[in-house]
Design a protein with these regions (language model features):
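S-adenosyl-L-methionine-dependent methyltransferase catalytic core, i.e., the SAM/SAH-binding region
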Residues: 1-310
Length: 310
């Protein structure tokens, strides 16, 4: 298999899901179906629900998972809506959930999707090609202040003001239509020292724009707010993140559900209504092994957090 399509932290996810042959499991970010294939292969009378916002991913994974027959159900949808999707399917509770966040390797590798700053393509970056907002809209239509905000908040780009200003000046001459046109604009805004750094100068900006186009951070928050409620007691939640913004949301979401009642100790009765619903299986995130990194360098920034329903 192409290294770009190797499922990240596969062994660790399967081990921590504690898969039961008769259980119900959710892969909320189906992608190429690598994680799902391993889950479905461990089911006898159980069911796997695979969700992805990318119709191309649904089609490809569907072919890969076809041998499992009706043990697998695939849904075109956003992982942020996992709880609602399960309700729609008439599924009250599940035994495990897996979410592999961020852009998938096939999306990066398919030049025309516009995710990569290494190849020329139309400015798109939509994970769901049926959605309206594209990178072209963000780059060419959003106000300078909003561009500066997303570059700083989502890309943690220290040159956000300079890059936002350069984008606005460039698009005033003519629309920025392709990925490499945008890369040129970003390069023009950065000082020489930044251009000599090991990291590609457009990496942070492309991340920021992609997150904005796909509303990725809000999606993670909504998932963490609602999806764990669909776990049975003892069911496991596995979330793989690839940058600190996602990981912070996941970590905070688990911690909030671990603490339970927030009322003062002296309060005679609980009035906040919060109860503990999760416990962390490991306090620190699980990281890829050196062996995995040798086979799949794209796994380098991956972090897996695991929690159990209580």
């Amino acid at each position: 298999m192409d290294a770009g399509h190797i499922p990240v932290l596969l062994h660790e996810c399967i081990e921590n899901l504690n898969i039961r042959p008769d259980g119900i499991y959710v892969d909320g970010t189906l992608g190429m179906g690598g994680h799902s294939e391993q889950i479905a292969g461990r089911l006898t009378t159980g069911t796997l629900i695979g969700i992805d916002r990318d119709e191309t991913a649904i089609a490809r994974a569907g072919a890969r998972l076809a041998p499992f027959g009706d043990r697998v159900q695939l849904v075109h949808g956003n992982f942020r809506d996992t709880a609602a999707i399960l309700d729609r399917l008439g599924i009250g509770a599940v035994d495990g959930m897996l979410f592999d966040l961020g852009v998938s390797s096939p999306q990066l590798d398919e030049t025309q999707r516009g995710f990569s700053y290494m190849h020329d393509a139309p400015l798109d970056m939509r994970m769901d090609a049926t959605s309206g907002l594209s990178a072209w809209n963000v780059v060419n239509e959003w106000p300078e202040g909003e561009l500066k905000r997303i570059l700083y908040e989502y890309g943690e780009e220290r040159y956000a003001p300079r890059i936002a200003g350069a984008i606005v000046r460039a698009r005033a001459q003519q629309p920025i239509a392709t990925t490499l046109e945008l890369v040129d604009v970003i390069r023009s805004a950065m000082p020489g020292a930044a251009l000599r750094e090991k990291q590609h100068p457009a990496k942070r900006s492309f991340q920021a724009i992609r997150i904005a186009v796909n509303d990725e951070l809000a999606a993670v928050r909504e998932m963490m707010d609602t999806a764990p409620d669909k776990l049975r007691v003892g069911g496991r939640l596995c979330v793989i993140s690839f940058h600190s913004l996602e990981d912070r949301i996941v970590k905070t979401g688990i911690a909030r559900r671990e603490h339970g009642c927030t009322c003062p100790r002296e309060a005679p009765v609980c009035t906040c209504g919060f109860v503990q619903t999760l416990r962390s299986v490991s306090r620190k995130p699980i990281l890829p092994s050196e062996e995995e990194l040798e086979c799949n360098p794209r796994a380098r920034s991956a972090k897996l957090r695991v929690a159990e329903r209580v």
